[in-house]
From Swiss-Prot:
Protein name: Ferredoxin--NADP reductase
Lineage: Bacteria, Pseudomonadati, Pseudomonadota, Alphaproteobacteria, Rickettsiales
S-S bonds: none
Family note: Belongs to the ferredoxin--NADP reductase type 2 family.
Catalytic activities: 2 reduced [2Fe-2S]-[ferredoxin] + NADP(+) + H(+) = 2 oxidized [2Fe-2S]-[ferredoxin] + NADPH
Cofactor comment text: Binds 1 FAD per subunit.
Keyword Flavoprotein: yes
Keywords for this protein: FAD, Flavoprotein, NADP, Oxidoreductase
Enzyme class: oxidoreductase
Amino acid sequence: MEYSSVFDVAIVGAGPVGLFTVFQAGMLGMNSCVIDALDIVGGQCAVLYPEKPIYDIPGYPMITAQDLVNNLKKQAEPFAPVYIMGQFVESISEGPDCFVLQTNKGTSVKCRAIIVAAGSGGFGPNRPPLDGIMEYENKSVFYNVSQMATFKNKKVVIAGGGDSAADWAVNLAEVADKLYVIHRRKSFRCAPNTLKKLEELADEGRINVLIPYQLAGLDGENGELRSVVVRNITTKEEIPIGADFLLPFFGISANLGEIVNWGLGVEGFQIPVEQSTCRTRRSKIYAVGDIAAYPGKIKLILVGFSEAALACQDIRAVLFPDTPLNFQYSTSKGIPTL
């Protein structure tokens, strides 16, 4: 498929920052398309933790990840973005007047500027090395929580010691019948406030924390768990824990895919940018959100929102040099019509 029109901006990535970039571009009179390898918008927020509460979005004391995604998508709707989902950009070629992006499914998109808002790129869970685990996946073994109600009055085992493990332990303690947290070490790598809540719930007997233990095996049939076997790292003793669900939170494996071949000077999993404009080393290609790197960078959604505004302001000046921008606050000009 080939889109005949030339978009002002092509946004690579439909996570929260990518969605807000649609809005920022639209507020400056620029139309856009959004390309993402996932079938749904929202990135990790929608796929890995839609019901996880987020506390550091300005104006929201608390908002779930999915509600944030829904609000951002609704905010972008007046600008009628074209969503090209379930596809990733394989190549970028540059002509005299525009870029041409080719996806893995043969879609061709023309645009005048590109904003990469791809987060950490493609992602997938780090699967624990347990025999037969794939038989249970998406039945009684999950790497994310999409609906907390699934675990109501159930026996749940959480494995891991990072933010996801600790956050979900605290949240699922409100609904689970029994909740176990399995961790190899005494220390957890999570926010201090979350750790405090975790310890309080453990003291109250609402969470059973097993340290130093690791996963050793699964027991069940037809994809339904009966128990999770854990092993004491010090004594090597193994014990079964009755369980309906196992949630292994060992992080995700990120993959930037073809982005590393776009001539953007990728370092690790990030693209170096000019802090004030989010320009990359290629003209008219920008990077925002977690994938953008500069001295002092903080990986927060709200920082990505700011970067989206900076990039769109610069793109508008580059694409329309003869049309000065009369800056106005949104409270004064409202939502423009493209």
